[in-house]
Amino acid sequence: MFLKGRRCEIQGLGIGAFVYYRRVVEDQKDRILAEIIKVAQAISAPAEAIAALQAAQSEHQFGKAMDDVKDAIPQRLLIEGQNPLTLLHSALSKGVHNHSDETCLGLATDIRLVLGELAELLGHALKDERELKKAVSRLRRLPS
């Protein structure tokens, strides 16, 4: 789905790219939230934030799920100080019928960039936590 969106984007098909990327975000909502939950748990985020993220996974309405977690995203996953899920929801909620193909192409590019950055931040956060735990474990085993 993502690759189809990327192909449309490269070909300048804004509405097509927008629709494919919207499907990626909506279809992968639970998976994205699961990764965010892993980061939240790894960094010992407040229990309320983790509970909100878990509840959003059960929510069938994409918009409601995003509204429910707008304050639950760990700081280290913010992009330019902004919640990436809120940014994505804001772009996606406008709908293709309200925009020209050119505008949809710009939005599709923005959605792809935010998705990519979120994926990188998730990967780095989980890797950093694993590496830190290993380092602490190794240092604790050193003889006194």
Predicted regions and their residues:
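A short mid-domain helix/strand-loop element embedded in enzyme catalytic domains
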Residues: 1-4
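Amphipathic, oligomerization/interface secondary-structure segments
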Residues: 9-144
